[in-house]
Protein backbone atom coordinates (compact mmCIF):
# COMPACT_ATOMS: atom_id res chain seq x y z
CA UNK A 1 0.00 0.00 0.00
CA UNK A 2 1.40 3.33 -1.04
CA UNK A 3 0.30 6.69 0.26
CA UNK A 4 1.35 10.18 -0.55
CA UNK A 5 2.21 12.78 2.03
CA UNK A 6 2.19 15.63 -0.41
CA UNK A 7 -0.25 18.37 0.33
CA UNK A 8 -2.48 19.27 -2.53
CA UNK A 9 -2.93 22.93 -3.29
CA UNK A 10 -6.31 24.32 -2.35
CA UNK A 11 -8.22 25.14 -5.47
CA UNK A 12 -10.12 28.37 -5.70
CA UNK A 13 -13.75 27.70 -6.54
CA UNK A 14 -15.13 29.20 -9.73
CA UNK A 15 -18.65 28.90 -8.32
CA UNK A 16 -20.44 31.44 -6.14
CA UNK A 17 -20.76 30.75 -2.41
CA UNK A 18 -24.48 30.15 -2.79
CA UNK A 19 -26.72 29.32 -5.71
CA UNK A 20 -28.02 32.55 -7.13
CA UNK A 21 -25.23 34.80 -5.84
CA UNK A 22 -24.60 37.68 -8.22
CA UNK A 23 -20.90 38.32 -8.60
CA UNK A 24 -19.61 41.75 -9.64
CA UNK A 25 -19.26 42.01 -13.43
CA UNK A 26 -17.10 44.95 -14.49
CA UNK A 27 -18.78 45.04 -17.91
CA UNK A 28 -22.28 45.80 -16.60
CA UNK A 29 -22.09 46.69 -12.89
CA UNK A 30 -21.50 50.09 -11.33
CA UNK A 31 -18.05 49.98 -9.67
CA UNK A 32 -19.25 52.55 -7.10
CA UNK A 33 -21.94 50.21 -5.76
CA UNK A 34 -20.61 48.37 -2.72
CA UNK A 35 -22.08 45.53 -0.73
CA UNK A 36 -21.66 45.73 3.04
CA UNK A 37 -22.15 42.06 3.87
CA UNK A 38 -19.24 39.68 3.61
CA UNK A 39 -20.35 36.16 2.81
CA UNK A 40 -23.90 35.15 2.12
CA UNK A 41 -26.44 37.80 1.10
CA UNK A 42 -30.00 36.80 2.10
CA UNK A 43 -33.16 37.08 0.02
CA UNK A 44 -35.64 39.84 0.92
CA UNK A 45 -38.21 37.36 2.24
CA UNK A 46 -35.81 35.89 4.82
CA UNK A 47 -36.51 38.83 7.14
CA UNK A 48 -40.08 37.62 7.64
CA UNK A 49 -41.41 40.78 6.06
CA UNK A 50 -43.01 41.52 2.73
CA UNK A 51 -41.72 43.93 0.11
CA UNK A 52 -39.15 46.27 1.70
CA UNK A 53 -40.09 49.53 -0.02
CA UNK A 54 -41.45 52.82 1.35
CA UNK A 55 -45.07 52.96 0.26
CA UNK A 56 -44.90 49.20 -0.45
CA UNK A 57 -46.41 47.73 -3.61
CA UNK A 58 -48.83 50.61 -4.39
CA UNK A 59 -45.85 53.00 -4.67
CA UNK A 60 -44.06 50.62 -7.04
CA UNK A 61 -47.20 50.12 -9.14
CA UNK A 62 -47.61 53.89 -9.47
CA UNK A 63 -43.96 54.33 -10.50
CA UNK A 64 -44.43 51.89 -13.41
CA UNK A 65 -47.89 53.17 -14.46
CA UNK A 66 -46.44 54.55 -17.73
CA UNK A 67 -45.82 51.00 -18.97
CA UNK A 68 -49.55 50.28 -18.97
CA UNK A 69 -49.91 52.70 -21.89
CA UNK A 70 -47.12 51.03 -23.87
CA UNK A 71 -47.59 50.23 -27.56
CA UNK A 72 -49.34 46.95 -28.26
CA UNK A 73 -47.14 44.13 -29.51
CA UNK A 74 -47.47 40.38 -29.78
CA UNK A 75 -45.03 39.85 -26.90
CA UNK A 76 -46.29 38.24 -23.71
CA UNK A 77 -44.50 36.69 -20.78
CA UNK A 78 -42.40 37.76 -17.82
CA UNK A 79 -39.41 40.03 -17.28
CA UNK A 80 -37.68 39.58 -13.93
CA UNK A 81 -35.13 42.06 -12.64
CA UNK A 82 -33.08 40.87 -9.67
CA UNK A 83 -30.74 43.15 -7.77
CA UNK A 84 -29.06 43.79 -4.44
CA UNK A 85 -30.22 46.39 -1.92
CA UNK A 86 -27.20 47.25 0.22
CA UNK A 87 -27.05 48.26 3.90
CA UNK A 88 -27.49 51.92 2.87
CA UNK A 89 -30.65 51.25 0.82
CA UNK A 90 -28.79 51.69 -2.49
CA UNK A 91 -29.22 49.22 -5.34
CA UNK A 92 -26.92 47.55 -7.84
CA UNK A 93 -25.89 44.36 -9.65
CA UNK A 94 -29.04 44.25 -11.75
CA UNK A 95 -29.73 41.04 -13.68
CA UNK A 96 -32.54 40.44 -16.16
CA UNK A 97 -34.35 37.23 -17.07
CA UNK A 98 -36.96 37.09 -19.82
CA UNK A 99 -39.39 34.23 -20.40
CA UNK A 100 -42.61 33.48 -22.23
CA UNK A 101 -45.88 32.40 -20.61
CA UNK A 102 -44.62 28.80 -20.58
CA UNK A 103 -41.55 29.94 -18.59
CA UNK A 104 -39.23 29.29 -21.52
CA UNK A 105 -36.43 31.77 -22.31
CA UNK A 106 -37.31 34.44 -24.84
CA UNK A 107 -36.23 37.96 -25.74
CA UNK A 108 -38.58 40.91 -25.48
CA UNK A 109 -38.19 44.12 -27.47
CA UNK A 110 -34.96 45.77 -26.22
CA UNK A 111 -36.67 49.15 -25.79
CA UNK A 112 -39.25 47.66 -23.42
CA UNK A 113 -36.61 45.84 -21.36
CA UNK A 114 -34.44 48.97 -21.17
CA UNK A 115 -37.44 51.07 -20.10
CA UNK A 116 -38.27 48.59 -17.32
CA UNK A 117 -34.63 48.44 -16.19
CA UNK A 118 -34.30 52.24 -16.17
CA UNK A 119 -37.51 52.66 -14.17
CA UNK A 120 -36.34 49.97 -11.72
CA UNK A 121 -33.00 51.74 -11.23
CA UNK A 122 -34.87 55.02 -10.59
CA UNK A 123 -36.81 53.55 -7.66
CA UNK A 124 -35.71 55.16 -4.42
CA UNK A 125 -37.15 54.13 -1.11
CA UNK A 126 -35.73 50.66 -0.55
CA UNK A 127 -35.71 49.83 3.15
CA UNK A 128 -32.46 48.58 4.64
CA UNK A 129 -32.50 44.91 5.62
CA UNK A 130 -31.74 43.53 9.06
CA UNK A 131 -32.11 45.93 11.98
CA UNK A 132 -30.74 49.32 13.02
CA UNK A 133 -27.85 47.78 14.98
CA UNK A 134 -26.81 45.51 12.14
CA UNK A 135 -28.11 46.46 8.69
CA UNK A 136 -27.48 43.92 5.94
CA UNK A 137 -27.61 43.68 2.17
CA UNK A 138 -30.31 41.56 0.54
CA UNK A 139 -31.47 40.34 -2.86
CA UNK A 140 -34.70 41.79 -4.22
CA UNK A 141 -36.53 41.04 -7.43
CA UNK A 142 -39.41 42.48 -9.39
CA UNK A 143 -41.22 40.38 -11.98
CA UNK A 144 -43.22 42.18 -14.64
CA UNK A 145 -46.08 40.32 -16.31
CA UNK A 146 -46.42 41.54 -19.89
CA UNK A 147 -49.38 40.84 -22.19
CA UNK A 148 -49.46 42.21 -25.71
CA UNK A 149 -46.50 44.46 -24.91
CA UNK A 150 -48.29 46.10 -21.97
CA UNK A 151 -47.59 45.80 -18.25
CA UNK A 152 -50.32 43.80 -16.53
CA UNK A 153 -48.87 43.12 -13.08
CA UNK A 154 -45.74 43.57 -10.96
CA UNK A 155 -44.79 40.82 -8.53
CA UNK A 156 -44.03 40.27 -5.65
Q: What kind of region is each of these model predictions?
A:
Residues 6-156:
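Charge-biased low-complexity segments
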Amino acid sequence: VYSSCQKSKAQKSVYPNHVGDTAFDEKIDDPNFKVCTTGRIPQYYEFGKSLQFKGEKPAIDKHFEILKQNESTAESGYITIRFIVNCEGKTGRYRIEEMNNDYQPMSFDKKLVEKILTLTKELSGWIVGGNTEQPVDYYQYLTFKIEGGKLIEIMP
